[in-house]
């Protein structure tokens, strides 16, 4: 698909499908990092995570699951600023954590209010990575806690 068949205004997978008049399961889109075609499950996952489409030379790109996790981990190592509890995050941003868009640092899904409450109740810290606040969604939280119990490295 190129800019000739649909405009480059689409920012999400859903907008891309609407503008190009195709259905989500039939969308074929490449990974911006590894250049492989995303599987249908990866396209759905990308859409569910509310991630943005990237345009290069008139073509839209997304990111496959493996590249999302890999580049997320690289970003943690290279751009970790510091960790802080919810009250510090709110003090610094002058907003409640519920008003902030905080994504999971592993899968990049926006955290729901329940997931933000989980951080507060469990006294877990949020992480400032590349000047953006991140935390863990419930799915990634569970896998990280299991790893910690087995004395493995942190997620």
From Swiss-Prot:
Molecular functions per Gene Ontology: DNA binding; zinc ion binding
Chain ranges of zinc fingers (unnamed): 31-67, 104-140
Localization annotation: Host cytoplasm; Host nucleus
UniProt keyword list: Activator, DNA-binding, Early protein, Host cytoplasm, Host nucleus, Host-virus interaction, Inhibition of host innate immune response by virus, Metal-binding, Modulation of host cell apoptosis by virus, Transcription, Transcription regulation, Viral immunoevasion, Zinc, Zinc-finger
Domain of life: Viruses
GO cellular component: host cell cytoplasm; host cell nucleus
Assembly mode: Forms homodimers. Interacts with ubiquitin-protein ligase UBE3A/E6-AP; this interaction stimulates UBE3A ubiquitin activity. Interacts with host TP53 and EP300; this interaction inhibits TP53 activity.
Function text: This protein may be involved in the oncogenic potential of this virus (cervical neoplasia-associated virus). Plays a major role in the induction and maintenance of cellular transformation. E6 associates with host UBE3A/E6-AP ubiquitin-protein ligase and modulates its activity. Sequesters tumor suppressor TP53 in the host cytoplasm and modulates its activity by interacting with host EP300 that results in the reduction of TP53 acetylation and activation. In turn, apoptosis induced by DNA damage is inhibited. E6 also protects host keratinocytes from apoptosis by mediating the degradation of host BAK1. May also inhibit host immune response.
Protein name, entry field: Protein E6
């Amino acid at each position: 698909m190129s800019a000739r068949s649909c405009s480059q205004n689409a920012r999400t997978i859903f907008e891309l499908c609407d503008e190009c008049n195709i259905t989500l399961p039939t969308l074929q889109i490449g990974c911006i990092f590894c250049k492989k075609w995303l599987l249908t499950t990866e396209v759905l996952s990308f859409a569910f995570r509310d991630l943005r489409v990237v345009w290069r030379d008139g073509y839209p790109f997304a990111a496959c699951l493996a590249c999302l996790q890999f580049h997320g981990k690289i970003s943690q190592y290279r751009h970790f600023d510091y960790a802080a509890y919810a009250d510090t995050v709110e003090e610094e941003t002058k907003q409640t954590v519920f008003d902030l868009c905080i994504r999971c640092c592993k899968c990049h899904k926006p955290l729901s209010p329940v997931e933000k409450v989980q951080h507060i109740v469990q006294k877990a810290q949020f992480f400032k990575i590349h000047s953006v606040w991140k935390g863990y969604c419930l799915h990634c939280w569970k896998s990280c806690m299991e790893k910690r119990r087995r004395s493995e490295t942190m997620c």
